[in-house]
């Protein structure tokens, strides 16, 4: 991809041969952001494990990620009142199932009570393709719909590596205080290390970098980051 003059000028601010501590990396990454909007600060970390399909889970960012999350909840009876009170934008049962079956997916996260999953499961081709299918492991198939909605809206994100073993996550906005971004990043590291498979050998996190939506990626001293986060 052809890079513009602005990117090339900003790239000179970052020594690409150096690995920075997390505080320095966040400061540098933010200083290279050149979007006119409030860009996202993202992390990328490569995990070393033989079965990548087993690496997945959820992370609750203490300061959220700055993203507004529109939540849909499939539930019945009093649970609908609980979901609405927690702030879910869309709440219903068969009426919503029919709407989604028609191709509507104008929401960012989906929760369902266990008794709804027989019907929600039929939406697999639509919800699964967009990564919206409720899952017990992710805490989105639950009887406590209020808790699930609150967690999704307060910054809980799902993670899993791509085919190359790299986990990509947005950890906040460029406008966030550095300390809040650092705390979010340390929470990511703590969760990844906590969820590390018991038979993973050697250094589980091989590389780590921080970058803005549009800007320069900054390499992080991953060993120091892990040692000071857990």
UniProtKB/Swiss-Prot annotation:
InterPro entries: Ribosom_uL1_bac-type, Ribosomal_uL1, Ribosomal_uL1-like, Ribosomal_uL1/biogenesis, Ribosomal_uL1_3-a/b-sand, Ribosomal_uL1_CS. The gene is rplA. Keywords: Repressor, Ribonucleoprotein, Ribosomal protein, RNA-binding, rRNA-binding, Translation regulation, tRNA-binding. The lineage of its organism: Bacteria, Pseudomonadati, Spirochaetota, Spirochaetia, Leptospirales. One of its GO terms (cellular component) is large ribosomal subunit. It comes from Leptospira borgpetersenii serovar Hardjo-bovis (strain JB197). One of its GO terms (biological process) is translation. The keyword rRNA-binding applies. This is Large ribosomal subunit protein uL1. Gene3D superfamilies: 3.30.190.20, 3.40.50.790.
